[in-house]
Amino acid sequence: MRIGHGYDVHRFAEGDFITLGGVRIAHHFGLLAHSDGDVLLHALSDALLGAAALGDIGKHFPDTDPQFKGADSRVLLRHVVALIHAKGWKIGNVDNTIVAQAPKMAPHIETMRALIAEDLQVELDQVNVKATTTEKLGFVGREEGIAVHSVALLQRP
């Protein structure tokens, strides 16, 4: 059994939506990133890669590589899943915490869980997504960006 932790942050930038957990959410900012900026799927990918001792997303999908410009993070996550399966691991469960002052996440969480479960090839009850604020403290509280913590448990079949 292996446990991995992932963490990612993206700052807000000009735009009118963000993508989190594969869900497009209307917002008065976008997220600054080389790919689609899905900070949730980036943190989750790092947690999975870390648990399998396969490095991090920067190693597999460098932001200096033009092929990943604007990349769909769901496609990247599916590639990560293929890598961990190739190493003989299966996913036990994943737990994700979105840290954001805005926008409100509650209306989108069940859709995020369903999309993530699909991409991970696991049951819905193996995927948790929750959200919290920082009570207006720090860069998140000032609405300068969004952070996500992810934990993944891998097991041998």
UniProtKB/Swiss-Prot annotation:
Task: Please give the Pfam families that the UniProt record associates with this protein.
Answer: YgbB
Which Gene Ontology MF annotations are present?
A: 2-C-methyl-D-erythritol 2,4-cyclodiphosphate synthase activity; metal ion binding
* Pathway in which this enzyme or protein is active: Isoprenoid biosynthesis; isopentenyl diphosphate biosynthesis via DXP pathway; isopentenyl diphosphate from 1-deoxy-D-xylulose 5-phosphate: step 4/6
According to UniProt, the reaction catalysed is: 4-CDP-2-C-methyl-D-erythritol 2-phosphate = 2-C-methyl-D-erythritol 2,4-cyclic diphosphate + CMP
- Record CDD domains: MECDP_synthase (cd00554)
Q: Which SUPFAM superfamilies match?
A: IpsF-like
Q: Which UniProt keywords apply?
A: Isoprene biosynthesis, Lyase, Metal-binding
The cofactor note reads: Binds 1 divalent metal cation per subunit.
Q: Where does 4-CDP-2-C-methyl-D-erythritol 2-phosphate bind?
A: 8-10, 34-35, 56-58, 61-65, 100-106, 132-135, 139, 142
Q: What is its EC number?
A: 4.6.1.12
Site (Transition state stabilizer) found at 34, 133
List, alphabetically, the InterPro entries matched. MECDP_synthase, MECDP_synthase_CS, MECDP_synthase_sf
**Which cofactors are named for this entry?**
a divalent metal cation
As given in the record, the signal peptide range reads none
The record lists a divalent metal cation as bound by 8, 10, 42
One GO biological process term: terpenoid biosynthetic process
Which Gene3D superfamilies does UniProt cross-reference here?
A: 2-C-methyl-D-erythritol 2,4-cyclodiphosphate synthase (3.30.1330.50)
Q: How does it assemble?
A: Homotrimer.
Protein function: Involved in the biosynthesis of isopentenyl diphosphate (IPP) and dimethylallyl diphosphate (DMAPP), two major building blocks of isoprenoid compounds. Catalyzes the conversion of 4-diphosphocytidyl-2-C-methyl-D-erythritol 2-phosphate (CDP-ME2P) to 2-C-methyl-D-erythritol 2,4-cyclodiphosphate (ME-CPP) with a corresponding release of cytidine 5-monophosphate (CMP).
User: What is the similarity comment for this entry?
Assistant: Belongs to the IspF family.
| Record's protein name | 2-C-methyl-D-erythritol 2,4-cyclodiphosphate synthase
